[in-house]
Design a protein with these regions (language model features):
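Phosphate- and other anionic-substrate recognition elements at nucleic-acid/protein interfaces
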Residues: 1-114
């Protein structure tokens, strides 16, 4: 059976931060930070699939911002399912006001899963 893994990406011009999430888990996993290059996204997904040891379908997403559609187009040309989320859809939990790239990536992955 193929697992669906949601990859939240907090993207900036200086770096990308990734976090994976599955619909049956309550916590993100495989957090990583890389240089800002779409090939790093593909490499990251290959590493996650290898670690899991099973066939995986990935759905990636990032919040609309400075990169616009460029990352989206690069990933979809490579066959990667990618979604751009509007900032207004990003729910902030009360009490978690400290923003970090890791938290943002996990939040994006969670939004993709649900």
């Amino acid at each position: 059976m193929t697992s669906i893994i949601y990859v939240g990406m907090d993207v900036h011009t200086t770096n990308f931060t990734f976090c994976c999430y599955t619909a049956d888990s309550d916590r993100g996993f495989a957090v990583a930070q890389t240089e800002p290059d779409y090939r790093q996204v593909i490499k990251y997904m290959e590493c996650v699939q290898k670690q899991r040891g099973e066939e995986c379908k990935f759905v990636c997403g990032y919040e609309a911002g400075c990169l616009g559609y460029s990352l989206y187009h690069q990933l979809t040309r490579c066959g990667v399912d990618c979604v751009i989320l509007a900032p207004s859809t990003m729910h902030q939990e009360k009490g978690k006001r400290i923003k970090t790239d890791r938290r943002d990536a996990e939040n994006i992955a969670r939004r993709l899963a649900f």
